Every structure is written in C-alpha cells, then in structure tokens.
C-alpha cells in the first residue's frame, strides 16, 4: 500500500466513523444528543470517578466547552453531578440509567467495528495491523 492509499484510507475512515456514529444516533431513540455529547458520555462511562477536568483532558477541549456539554446532558437526563463527601468542591460525573443505556449501545457499535476489522485475519496480520495502529496512536499522542 503506497502513501496515497494509506492517506486516503485514514481520511475516509476518520470521516466515515464520525458520520456513521452521527447517523446511528439520529436513527435511534437518542436523537437528542450530538456525537460530541456521545463522546462525553463515553468518557464518563469509562472512568468511575470522572470529573469535568478529567473529561476536558480526555476530549482535549476546554473546561468551558465540557461544562456546556455537561449542562445539556444533565438537562436531558443522561448524566448527574454528585459532590464529593470528602471535598465539596469536587464534582463527580455519573451516568444515569438513560446514559448507561446509550453508552452500552455506543460500545456495542465499536465492538462490532473491531470484530469486523479483525475477522479472518491471521495472527501475523493482526500483529502487523497492531504495529501500524500503535504508530498512529503514538503519532497522535505526541501531537497533544
């Protein structure tokens, strides 16, 4: 695969994943959230003691941007804010029942995508792909 093919595939993959996630949200009963809000839910679902600062760092957006998203998600019933008993200045974010449901559906989409990618690959092919993905991941991490 030459440079242009790799570049074209990467560009297409990044764009398609975002579009497909957005379309699948619009076609579900969760049409009231955006893909950016879904990614916020995803971060909260991954970290049991998520805070607004943690979400901001994970999504690489400002705290103001996260706060706006959190306000919307709380109003829509996807998350709740709970103050720490030890330090009342600390606010933890938790998914509500509705938030946990959409988070599970989103994880299911990603699981199906990964399974489809590796289906039929030999161990050596998986290893080579893993090396390429590790290089891509590290490149993106270094840009942060």
Please tell me what each predicted stretch does.
Residues 11, 15-18, 71, 100, ...:
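A specific heptad-register position in long alpha-helical coiled-coils used by two-component signaling proteins
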Residues 15, 19-22, 75, 119, ...:
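Regular, well-ordered alpha-helical segments
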Residues 1-31:
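N-terminal leader segment of winged-helix/HTH proteins
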Residues 42-46, 107, 134:
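Short, locally clustered residues in the helix-turn-helix/winged-helix DNA-binding domain
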Residues 6, 13, 108-144:
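Terminal interaction helix/tail motif
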Residues 22-62:
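N-terminal helix-turn-helix DNA-binding core of bacterial DNA-binding proteins
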Residues 72-128:
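Charged, amphipathic alpha-helical coiled-coil/dimerization segments
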